[in-house]
């Protein structure tokens, strides 16, 4: 039975998501939200999980929201523990502006929880140079960012050849830019082709699946004083 929905963004309130839907839900997008909320009615108990981010909090692309004290990014990901296997839920990476230890962290969590399937809430790629927000002057050029994104996406695909991704607003920037100049968004319909990737990554607006009674776990990426991952898997 399909019991869980993953989308890039529902709302900024995980509690509202849990109360609103008749199924479990997973989202990303909100970098400063890292929580799980349960809700119940006479028929069932359900949960909603928001999984933070893996974007480098001190990187160029994170500078836009750096001064908002109450919206500091929380580094981490999610795991859904199912009766027949566990699901790794990757948070917003914003390649090539992801944290330098993000891929090592993902592999460690994947191995620790012995995950059978890889899910990704979206914003895999940042597209900073093409953003509708003002770009930082010391950011990569659009050409350099594109080639760096290709490089890191290929590296991530070598780690996780198969992945289901719900498209994020940053992933969609090329489509949005095409529409802005009067061209059809369908010209950028194939993200895998755009970034030279194999077909093992499936991109979709939303993903519904049977978690087999899955329960959510948040796994924070804890940094040491030097800003590097502490090499430990912390579950909560």
Where are these regions (language model features)?
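Short acidic-hydrophobic, aromatic-tinged amphipathic segments that line or gate anion-handling sites
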Residues: 202-205
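Conserved beta-sheet core of the metallophosphoesterase superfamily
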Residues: 4-79, 212-236
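Flexible, charged surface loops at secondary-structure boundaries
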Residues: 1, 18-21, 110-114, 157-159, ...
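Active-site flanking residues adjacent to catalytic metal/cofactor-binding acidic residues
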Residues: 2, 28, 91, 121-123, ...
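Core catalytic region of metal-dependent phosphoesterases/phosphodiesterases
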Residues: 90, 95-199
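A short beta-strand-loop-alpha-helix capping motif that often carries His-Thr
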Residues: 1, 171-175, 217-219
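Beta-strand-turn-beta hairpins that frame and shape the catalytic cleft
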Residues: 1, 83-88, 209-216
């Amino acid at each position: 039975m399909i019991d869980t929905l993953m989308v890039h963004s529902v709302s900024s309130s995980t509690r509202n998501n849990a109360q609103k839907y008749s199924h479990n839900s997973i989202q990303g997008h909100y970098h400063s939200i890292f929580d799980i909320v349960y809700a119940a009615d006479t028929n069932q108990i359900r949960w909603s999980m928001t999984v933070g981010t893996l974007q480098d909090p001190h990187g160029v692309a994170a500078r836009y929201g750096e001064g908002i004290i109450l919206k500091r990014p929380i580094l981490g990901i999610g795991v859904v523990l199912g009766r027949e296997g566990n699901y790794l839920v990757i948070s917003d990476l914003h390649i090539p502006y992801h944290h330098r230890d993000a891929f090592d962290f993902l592999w460690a969590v994947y191995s620790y929880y012995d995950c059978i399937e890889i899910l990704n809430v979206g914003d895999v790629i940042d597209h900073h140079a093409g953003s509708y927000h003002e770009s930082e002057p010391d950011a990569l050029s659009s050409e350099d960012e594109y080639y760096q994104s290709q490089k890191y996406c290929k590296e991530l695909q070598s780690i996780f050849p198969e992945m289901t991704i719900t498209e994020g607003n940053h992933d969609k920037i090329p489509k949005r830019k095409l529409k802005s100049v009067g061209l059809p968004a369908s010209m950028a319909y194939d993200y895998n082709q755009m970034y030279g990737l194999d077909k093992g990554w499936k991109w979709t607006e939303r993903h519904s699946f049977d978690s087999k009674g899955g329960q959510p776990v948040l796994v924070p990426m804890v940094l040491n004083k030097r800003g590097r991952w502490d090499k430990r898997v912390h579950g909560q």
